[in-house]
Amino acid sequence: MATKPDSRISWLQLLQRGQHYMKTWPAEKQLAPVFPENRVARATRFGIRIMPPLAVFTLTWQIALGGQLGPAIATALFACSLPLQGLWWLGRRSVTPLPPTLAQWFHEIRHKLLESGQALAPLEEAPTYQSLADVLKRAFSQLDKTFLDDL
C-alpha cells in the first residue's frame, strides 16, 4: 500500500469497512490486471460461504474419529479466520490514501462524471481507495467504457 492508513480505526470498524468496500468495488474484468481487489473479494466471498461449514465438518470429523480436540479446534479456528483476513485486508485498503498517479486518474473520472451532469458529494480530504471504488462504480453505471482508456 502506498501510505499507511489511519491507525485509530478499531478491528470491528475495519472489518465493516472491508465488507462495505467489497460490496462497493465494481467487479469488472477490465480492472483485474491493475487492482487485486477483484481476486481478494472473490476469495473472501468464497471463504465466508465455505469456511464455517468446513470448520464444523473438521470438528465433528475429529471428534467422531476419537482424535485430539486441540488440533481440531486449531484447524477450525484457522479456517474461520481466513475470511476475516480478507475483510481486514479490504478494510485497510479502503482507508488507504491513493498514490499520486491513481489520485490523478480518480480526479479525471470524477471530472467526467461532473461534466456529464452527475451529482457527486464534495471531497473533504485526500481520496482513498473507498472513494475510488465509489467513483468507479458510478462511472461504470453512468459513463461509457472510454474512461478506462487512460488506465
From Swiss-Prot:
Its keywords, alphabetically, are: Cell inner membrane, Cell membrane, Membrane, Transmembrane, Transmembrane helix
The SS bond pairs are none
Q: Where, subcellularly, is it found?
A: Cell inner membrane
Membrane topology of the entry: Multi-pass membrane protein
Determine the domain of life of the protein's source: Bacteria
Residue stretches spanning the membrane: 46-66, 69-89
GO CC annotation: what is one? plasma membrane
Does the entry feature the keyword Signal, yes or no?
Answer: no
What InterPro entries does the annotation carry? UPF0208
Family to which this protein belongs:
Belongs to the UPF0208 family.
Q: Which HAMAP family match?
A: UPF0208
Recorded protein name is: UPF0208 membrane protein PC1_2779
